[in-house]
């Protein structure tokens, strides 16, 4: 019915093998659609051995095109050794547009860079020297050394004055303390004085009592 051979499991009509799904006529595999003879894939049209694409004729590994011999990455042509982007030749290092050599251009660039860097440095110096002294006084610029020295000397004078005032203040404070210590009496002394006062008053009261007794005695005598 099927015309299929038992031994090989191969179909007569298609001549296709069951196991491999491979066609006799074309020797092409169903699954991969890859040809035995050329090892070329149907879908991509890409060859196994070279990894080269039919349509573009471009190699995978180098990314280089057959027709132009131009590399993808650098965009540089093999024959002329000329770069697409810059239009600059390898051998001479000369630019198409300007017809100017690299060496001179580089020299100009370095000169320009040098000038700008020097200018920046001097600016920075100015900025740093506009900072403050140790005493916290503002310093205006690098060329005003005389003024700066005056500033420092003034600050020293003010320092000395401040120190003098502090010393005087301390002396005054000491005097005040001395006076206080002289005038102020110790609490022990005060308590002793108070005790003495009470003793004196008690003695007075004792003295008062005999006087009263005497008076009483006089009265009694008078009555008698």
UniProtKB/Swiss-Prot annotation:
Annotated Sequence repeat ranges: 1-6, 7-12, 13-18, 19-24, 25-30, 31-36, 37-42, 43-48, 49-54, 55-60, 61-66, 67-72, 73-78, 79-84, 85-90, 91-96, 97-102
Record keyword Repeat present: yes
The entry's keywords: Malaria, Repeat
Note: This variable antigen is associated with the surface of erythrocytes infected with mature stages of plasmodium falciparum.
Region: 17 X 6 AA tandem repeats of E-T-G-E-S-K, residue numbers: 1-102
Biased segments, Basic and acidic residues type: 1-137, 156-173, 185-217
Name the record gives this protein: Processed variable antigen
Organism: Plasmodium falciparum
Bias (Low complexity): 144-153
Region called Disordered, residue ranges: 1-224
